[in-house]
């Protein structure tokens, strides 16, 4: 597995891969020791969930709870952004139509229908920068909230540069439940964020954990709380072909995994969480690791979509994959097994003849009724 991940990462970046700094054995050992020390200190003080990929789960924002439970849809309202953050994973220069999961939604009504069809409980408006197209963003927020009311939690991501009193009040009137500011895009200025306090019900800051900004971020946790921020979400920084030059020039130590991530980013996030608890700041901090995003968010998509594809004789795994149990045997053996199912009045939707006479597809719950020695 390790070699396969390294090979995949190497292929993604080609010749540029050689520019990346990966930890030496001694560096890796020190980093693991520091990480273990932080986690040991946090043990018993935080709730760790989702296979150890997310903490602290005790004070998650309403939107984060829905995301973690797999009930969230993210609508990219536009592909354009007016900021050029060094950590951004994509170019953010295209004026794309509203899109999610590679499906375009040309009208708010289309998106409402999608949310209803798949049973979502939360929807976010993202980009790009959604406030570059306020009319479109307002239309989609308004349509979703009008249709679902309190049954749908709606939030919006923004760098805040285009926010003003009037626009924030319009978003509140449209029913927006939560707004998330990326203050890393504005050098951690809080003036626009303060405008949203008391206007939008839930005020959240969501930023990458930038290692060199660790002292600054620790020092402003109290200011965030006093400004009305209710939740701080910290993401692990991830390398992409778009941000490769920016991240590789900063001397970060990179880690192999399902994608290449920044070692120091995770350590910084854990230190911020530790600092917040040690000093009783009262601002819930959520570390959203790349593994959580890549594994559990993808799992949620699979489990939601698979409901429309799974056949009655198939099973769904915890990870959202379709599992088919195939019995192979002589034609006469398959025939006898089918006759046994019929004699027991087993629903014939729970089994199916295969595409060859010696094959039988059965739901796992029927396995106890099968003479396993007769099949292979």
Task: Annotate each PLM feature.
Residues 79-92:
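Local cysteine-cluster metal-coordination motifs and their immediate loop/turn environment
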Residues 301-321, 325:
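Short, low-complexity, polybasic intrinsically disordered segments
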Residues 11-75, 92-100:
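N-terminal [4Fe-4S]-dependent radical SAM core
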Residues 93-105, 118-133, 147-163, 171-189, ...:
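Core AdoMet radical
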């Amino acid at each position: 597995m390790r070699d396969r991940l390294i090979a995949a990462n190497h292929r993604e970046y080609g010749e540029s891969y050689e520019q990346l700094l990966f930890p030496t054995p001694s560096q890796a050992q020190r980093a693991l020791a520091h990480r273990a020390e932080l986690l040991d200190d946090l043990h018993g003080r935080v709730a760790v969930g989702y296979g150890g990929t997310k903490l602290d789960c005790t004070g998650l924002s309403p939107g984060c709870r829905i995301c973690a439970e797999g009930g969230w849809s993210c609508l990219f309202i536009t592909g354009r952004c007016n900021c050029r953050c060094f950590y951004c994973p994509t170019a953010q220069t295209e004026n794309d139509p509203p899109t999610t999961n590679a499906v375009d939604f040309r009208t708010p009504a289309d998106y409402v229908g999608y949310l209803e069809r798949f049973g979502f409980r939360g929807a976010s408006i993202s980009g790009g920068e959604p406030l570059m197209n306020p009319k479109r963003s307002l239309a989609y927020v308004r349509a979703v909230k009008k249709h679902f009311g309190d049954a749908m939690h709606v939030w919006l991501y923004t760098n805040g540069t285009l926010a003003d009193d009037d626009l924030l009040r319009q978003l509140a009137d449209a029913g927006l439940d939560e707004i998330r500011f990326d203050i890393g895009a504005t050098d951690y200025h809080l003036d626009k964020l303060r405008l949203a306090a008391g206007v939008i019900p839930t005020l959240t800051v969501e930023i990458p954990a930038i290692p060199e900004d660790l002292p600054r971020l620790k020092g402003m946790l109290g200011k965030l709380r006093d400004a009305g921020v209710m939740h701080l979400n910290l993401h692990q920084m991830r390398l992409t072909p778009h941000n490769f030059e920016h991240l590789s020039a900063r001397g970060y130590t990179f880690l192999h995994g399902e994608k290449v991530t920044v070692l120091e980013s995770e350590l910084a996030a854990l230190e911020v969480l530790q600092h917040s608890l040690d000093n009783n700041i009262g601002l819930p901090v959520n570390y959203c690791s790349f593994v959580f995003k890549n594994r559990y968010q993808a799992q949620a998509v699979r489990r939601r979509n698979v409901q429309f594809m799974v056949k009655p004789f198939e099973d769904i795994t915890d990870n959202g994959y379709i599992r088919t149990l195939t019995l192979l045997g002589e034609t006469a053996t398959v025939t006898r097994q089918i006759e046994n199912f019929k004699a027991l009045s087993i629903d014939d939707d729970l089994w199916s003849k295969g595409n060859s006479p010696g094959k039988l597809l059965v739901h796992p719950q029927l396995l106890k009724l099968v003479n396993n020695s007769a099949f292979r």
